[in-house]
Each structure stands twice: as structure tokens, then as C-alpha cells.
């Protein structure tokens, strides 16, 4: 969305869309184009503000920040992935989109998670993959190339509250645009600790090859369709380790 666009124009445009659709209640998605930005820096700003958050960055593809939950459900058993797919299809079927500009508008995202705990794995002989949770984020910031979009998903049960949602997404837009003035400046006192951690991580990555090959083999066998490999590492430090400084270095 052009930076010179005013809230009055945005409010008028989407309110007209809302009235023309005769919408009363249900799942809405409101999208607003924002200036291109550094997602890691932005995630640091929002990180402690929400109980649930997720961050994913790909250099040449779609990257996102997800905050808070609009809809979520947990699935277990052998057909948990099929259950999650059905949940996703249901969500996308229900979403009613509202947007100011449609050019390059990305789709909403439902994110899948599994949590691995040592005790659970030891007691889970017949099911090496724990249950999964599927989440439709309430707030979603998506970056594709140089285009960035801010989305809000919300279960609207009263059409009178639609304008409140428009005010809310505009408020997030303003926070994002003005984030540099809102950041607290920090001293990079632990740069040496970060360098030490990166050296440790580079050495540890060599030991991950076996796990990666085993994961790829599961996909090739058709046991899994896609995977995100995770492995716990133990690292001792006497200083506070800033995860965002690690990501930025």
C-alpha cells in the first residue's frame, strides 16, 4: 500500500467492501500492504508481546512472522497429518478476504507444529512423531521479494466490530513503520560469546549429516511428505545469549 494512503481512505475502501458483501459474521482476513522491512528486527520487537509466535525466513521464497492464535487444533494418531490437512481446508474455505490492494497478495498460512520431549519419545514406541498442532495466526506478516503484507485473521460475530479491526490493523502498521524509534538501544557486550556459539554450532552441524540423511530417507519412502529437522544441542555459557543477535550475525 502506498505510504501516502491515509487511514480515512483505507477505512472507506474496506468498509465499502464489507457492506457490498453483506457480511454478518464469520472468519475474516484483512490485508494491508506495508513497506519492505527486516523481519528479524521486527520479530525482536514483537517477540515478548505475545504468548504464541513463530518466525520463518527463506532468502528466495516467502518469509513470515506469526503472532497470536485465531484458530488452532491439536491432532494425534496415525492420521494426524490428514486431520491437519482437513482443518486447513476448512479454514481456507471459511475465510472471507478484505484488502486494499490485491497485487501480489499472498495467501494466509496455517502453520503446523510438533513438540518433542525426551520422556514422551521414550514412552511412544509405536509413534515416533508426536501429535501436531495446526494454527491459523491472528497476526501474520509476510515478506515475498520486496513486498510485505500485514494480515489480521479474526472470528467476527458482530458486523459492528469490523471497523474496530480496521483500526487495529492500522495501529499495527504504525507500530511497524515507527519501530526504530520504539526500540531500546542495547549494548553488544556479548559479541565474543556469540562468536564462540557460532563456532560451536558450525562444528556441531557436521554431526547432523546422519540425521538429515535419515530424514530424507523417510520422505523418499513416502512415510512423510515433508519435514523440518530439529535437534537439541547443549551449550554452556556464563552470559545471557541473545537469540536475535545470533540470527543477525
Language model regions located:
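Signature of the chorismate-utilizing enzyme
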Residues: 1-249
Amino acid at each position: 500500500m502506498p505510504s501516502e494512503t491515509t487511514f480515512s481512505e483505507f477505512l472507506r475502501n474496506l468498509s465499502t467492501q464489507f457492506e457490498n458483501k453483506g457480511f454478518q459474521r464469520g472468519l475474516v482476513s484483512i490485508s494491508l500492504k506495508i513497506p519492505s522491512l527486516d523481519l528479524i528486527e521486527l520479530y525482536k520487537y514483537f517477540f515478548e508481546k505475545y504468548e504464541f509466535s513463530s518466525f520463518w525466513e527463506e532468502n528466495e521464497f516467502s518469509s513470515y512472522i506469526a503472532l497470536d492464535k485465531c484458530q488452532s487444533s491439536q491432532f494425534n494418531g496415525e492420521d494426524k497429518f490428514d486431520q491437519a490437512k482437513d482443518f486447513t481446508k476448512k479454514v481456507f474455505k471459511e475465510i472471507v478476504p478484505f484488502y486494499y490492494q490485491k497485487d501480489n497478495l499472498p495467501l494466509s498460512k496455517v502453520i503446523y507444529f510438533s513438540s518433542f520431549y525426551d520422556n514422551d519419545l521414550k514412552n511412544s514406541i509405536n509413534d515416533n512423531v508426536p501429535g501436531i498442532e495446526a494454527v491459523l495466526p491472528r497476526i501474520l506478516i509476510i515478506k515475498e521479494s520486496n513486498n510485505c503484507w500485514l494480515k489480521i485473521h479474526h472470528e467476527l460475530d458482530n458486523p459492528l466490530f469490523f471497523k474496530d479491526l480496521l483500526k487495529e490493523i492500522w495501529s499495527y502498521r504504525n507500530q511497524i513503520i515507527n519501530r526504530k524509534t520504539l526500540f531500546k538501544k542495547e549494548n553488544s557486550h556479548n559479541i565474543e560469546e556469540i562468536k564462540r556459539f557460532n563456532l560451536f554450532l558450525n562444528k556441531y552441524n557436521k554431526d547432523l549429516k546422519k540425521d538429515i540423511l535419515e530424514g530424507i530417507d523417510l520422505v523418499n519412502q513416502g512415510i512423510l511428505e515433508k519435514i523440518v529437522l530439529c535437534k537439541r544441542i547443549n551449550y554452556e555459557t556464563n552470559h545471557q545469549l541473545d537469540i536475535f543477535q545470533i540470527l543477525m550475525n
